[in-house]
Amino acid sequence: MTQVEFVKLKRPEKARHLCELAEQFFNDGNKILIIVDDKNQAVTLDRFMWTWHKGSFIPHAFNNGAVDCLDEPIIIEIAECNPHGAEILIMGRPCSFEFMSHFRHVIDFAEVYDQQLASDARQRYASYRKTGFAVAMR
């Protein structure tokens, strides 16, 4: 069964949390897929992951089709595809339930600093439970 965990964001710092979570899961020996909205977000996150924390190294690649990234433990992706068989999905944007069901562990964000984003997160939380996912707050 897919386990979905929500991370509460009190400030718009999703990129930092994406990096922290990716590093934690990587250090535990997992392959991770990070899904973002578009190429601009993917390139920005790719660059940020190299510099976000002094002394931190997170091996990753943006699957832009120009580089072979299948051996990387962390892949940044725009489309709902899992090219390296990751079991961990970190959602920088919402994904379909069908896609989420292919992962053991999914991270979503409750962006409580914004009323509309918080409402959207509550709706996703309820939908995940109704779908049969195991849902919790992280």
Q: Where are the language model's segments positioned?
A:
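Short, charged/polar "capping" segments at the starts of alpha-helices
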Residues: 40-44, 115-117
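Long, hydrophobic N-terminal alpha-helical segment
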Residues: 1-42
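Helix-adjacent hinge/juxtasegments
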Residues: 46-84
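Structural motif
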Residues: 10, 36-39, 91-94, 111-112
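SF2 helicase motor core recognition
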Residues: 82-102
